[in-house]
Each structure stands twice: as C-alpha cells, then as structure tokens.
Amino acid sequence: MAEDLKDPAFLREFLGESVRVATIDMVVNALDQARKGAGLTKAALARAISVNPAVVRRLFSSERPNPTLGTLAEVAAALGMRLTLEPLPADERKAVTEPLLQGAVSADTAKEIAKQAVEKRKGSRRAPAPV
C-alpha cells in the first residue's frame, strides 16, 4: 500500500475515504451513546425526527453508513446535541491535510500512513447495535 500512496490520485482518494469513514464512525457512535443514555429506542428517535424507523436503524447499524449531514443534525438535535467542527491536531494535519493539498508524501510518510490505516481499520469496526 505504501507504494500505491505515491500516486497522487490514489493518495487523495485513500486519505479522503479514511477521514470520511473515521469521522462518520465517531459521530454515529457518539449519537448512539447519547440515544442509549437518553433511554430512547431507535423507533422513538425516528418518531421524534419524523423519519421512517429504517432510517435510524440503518444509521446505527454496523454496515458502512453514509448519512446525510441533515440526518445527523436532526438526530443530534433530538438528543440535545449539535454537530461542530474542530481543527485537526498538528500530527493529523501533517498526515492528512498536507498530503491532500500537496498530492504527495515522502516514502517514510507513505509507510507511516499505510501502517496507521491498517491499525485504525482493525480497531474501528463498529459493533452491531441491537434493535
């Protein structure tokens, strides 16, 4: 994979997808914890935001969700939360932002990105949430 990361198009696609998956997982997991903490079922949450219960079940499933920002904002609001953006820490900016903007990384950085990606993917699988 480190060799593939030398290709600017692959690098941008890989980093973009990695950040997308990690961010969605983080947001969805936080919303699911808030839902559980509030004692809400998925069906009750769906009623609160006037959507089909399948929308909420899909959001909290272990499959690779791709929710809209609107859905995430509505779910967050129903749980007394809001979505916010925060700057990346310096080490993540170096590993993600700079390569995205430049379209290139050094061989050492490519190896490190590949190593971190493998480690994150092993540990970031969301467990299926009971219905």
Residue map of PLM features:
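N-terminal flexible/basic segments that precede or flank functional cores
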Residues: 1-29, 94-131
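Short basic helix-loop element that most often maps to the first helix and adjoining turn
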Residues: 29-46
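DNA major-groove recognition helix of helix-turn-helix/homeodomain DNA-binding modules
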Residues: 70-85
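Short amphipathic recognition helices of helix-turn-helix/homeodomain-type DNA-binding modules
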Residues: 86-96
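Recognition helix of helix-turn-helix/homeodomain-like DNA-binding domains
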Residues: 50-66
